[in-house]
């Protein structure tokens, strides 16, 4: 058995590095508004919102091109991962939402049903015995059910 280490996801590490290279005086918003935390918004949209706020500020320093390239690649990677996860989830739901037909419709299934159907003393066909099989050797009459 291999012991696996739980490492943070790569896009999160890159986003932290990207945000760490920015100067506090650059005008980047220091905190996400409280209404954003309460909503169920994907991480890529939160990241895009923060970058759009930062780039819209007029008094910011010039953004190095490699930082913007890095941030855009992180954003694109996160978006692709979210789309893939959504597709996998849809396929999973579709696979298990379909009703399954019995695998044996005729032939062996009819023979097996006939073998398990018992007749009572008057010769009337009863229900399959495995549905009403008594436990501990006791006999159960059909009238009790």
Curated annotation (Swiss-Prot):
The modification Asparagine amide is found at residue 136. GO terms for cellular component: extracellular region. Residues 1-27 form the signal peptide. Residues 28-89, 92-117, 140-145 form a propeptide. PANTHER family: NEUROMEDIN-S (PTHR32414:SF2). Belongs to the NmU family. Isoform 6 encodes peptide NmS-33, at positions 92 to 124, as a result of splicing out of an exon that encodes a processing site which generates NmS-17. Similar 33-mers and 36-mers have been isolated from human and from mouse and rat, respectively, although they do not arise by alternative splicing. This is Neuromedin-S. The gene is nms.
């Amino acid at each position: 058995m291999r012991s696996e280490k739980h490492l943070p996801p790569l896009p999160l590490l890159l986003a932290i590095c990207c945000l760490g290279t920015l100067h506090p005086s650059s005008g980047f918003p220091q905190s996400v508004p409280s209404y954003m935390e309460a909503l169920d918004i994907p991480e890529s949209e939160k990241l895009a919102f923060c970058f759009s706020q930062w780039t819209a500020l007029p008094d910011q320093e010039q953004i190095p091109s490699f930082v913007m390239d890095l941030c855009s690649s992180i954003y694109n990677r996160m978006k692709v991962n979210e789309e893939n996860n959504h597709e996998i989830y849809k396929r999973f739901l579709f696979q298990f939402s379909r009703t399954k037909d019995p695998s044996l419709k005729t032939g062996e299934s009819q023979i097996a049903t006939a073998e398990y159907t018992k007749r009572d003393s008057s010769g009337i066909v009863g229900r399959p015995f495995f549905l009403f099989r008594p436990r501990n050797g006791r006999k159960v009459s059909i009238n009790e059910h």
